[in-house]
Amino acid sequence: MSGRSVRAETRSRAKDDIKKVMAAIERVRRWEKKWVTVGDTSLRIFKWVPVVDTKEKEKSKVSVGGEMQRKNFPSEESSDNACSVLLDFQDENSNQSSLSDSYQHKAAADSSNNSSPPASEPVSPAPQSLDYRTDDPQPPTLGQEIMEEPLLQSSEIADEPPTLIKEDLLPLTAQEDEDSCGAPPLKRICTEQVSVIQMVPLS
């Protein structure tokens, strides 16, 4: 008896989970990305907004549009605000709405904080750091010179590909011949072919 009841519980739980997943899928199908005005500001962000059916859209325009016209707001902002209100009410537990709302608040905070400083301060972090190193009045200590030289050498090596010189090839092939004496014949053939291929373009 207890086994049957446990199975029935898991079946009913699975059915509930399936219903939740299907509802979430249906909700996701009705979403689209739109430019939305943030609150009363002129800031517009590109975020996920639920796609409203034409019947629901007309109802929301009539109800929200009347309230917005009383407050002397344009109708475009009213439809965007209606979509954002629907976003909050339709999907309170979804990650999409919480992320978009947090992004909306962050964008609004950034716009209010960053509206005046960029006009007064030029932003150029990279040249300032380079100028600081070149104009450094103190000479570097012995330890600093040693640390800087390997960095320069490694960057020079990374920029230039290694080049093979005929003198470098000859000792390598001699070593390969010595090493390949005990190797199987296939390996000997391959190494000989590689050395021939490398020598041909140089000569």
Curated annotation (Swiss-Prot):
Annotated disulfide bonds: none
Pfam families given in the database record: BCL_N (PF04714)
Renumbered residue ranges of the record's region Disordered: 55-80, 94-148
Ranges annotated as biased composition (Low complexity): 109-129
UniProt family annotation: Belongs to the BCL7 family.
Protein name: B-cell CLL/lymphoma 7 protein family member B-A
The organism of origin for this protein: Danio rerio
Phylogenetic classification of the source organism: Eukaryota, Metazoa, Chordata, Craniata, Vertebrata
Gene that produces this protein: bcl7ba
